[in-house]
């Protein structure tokens, strides 16, 4: 029970930090999504690296992390945040967050589909209500005029992708790589930073942050894109 209580508190702490992700993302301004993802994860990775070294934990532990854990962790971190910042920059923040934050409902749904698990009527009702609300929002606002490109459509698709990626990661992380230590998150963050910066160089126009945007990026890396992941993995 004590261990479960600590895990619950860690999860609540992570969710509290993630509540800062949107306002800090808005404060960072129109920084290209891949660049913003790369910079924030570089800060988060260096934070984890510093803590690991301060505790005397050898960096060689990262080399023993199985390939499937690397693929799952880096894929989820990279995909979720690139889509998150894309949604936040192309949609009103409230609309984006309403869809993105469907991930807890999807965790309930995906968990119930696993072997030895089952969905109760209350679970299905809650999931249906959440999805119906999101569908009403999308159908009401995301329908563009015929033949007219609509950045908002990209934003809604990005937000839906966020919800699917993070719920899938949360379920699979416990099922497939539960024995991987939390120190692996440091490697995931650093690898995500490198991958995101490479994607920025290849796919995005240059657009460096200015002024107070750097403070927002630092805060993102230390909190929602740093400490939050170590708490969630716990």
Whereabouts are the PLM-identified features?
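Helix-helix packing/entry segments at the starts of transmembrane helices
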Residues: 9, 16, 39, 81, ...
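Glycine-/small-residue-enriched transmembrane alpha-helix faces in small-molecule transporters
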Residues: 1-44, 144-175, 194-195, 215-216, ...
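Transmembrane alpha-helices of multi-pass small-molecule transport proteins
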Residues: 7, 30-79, 104-110, 164-169, ...
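Cytoplasmic-side transmembrane-helix entry/capping segments in multi-pass membrane proteins
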Residues: 7-11, 64-72, 119-132, 178-189
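Loop-to-transmembrane alpha-helix entry segments
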Residues: 40, 64, 68, 97-100, ...
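Hydrophobic/aromatic residues within transmembrane alpha-helices
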Residues: 28, 36, 40, 87, ...
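Hydrophobic transmembrane alpha-helices of multi-pass small-molecule transport proteins
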Residues: 16, 48, 110, 119-142, ...
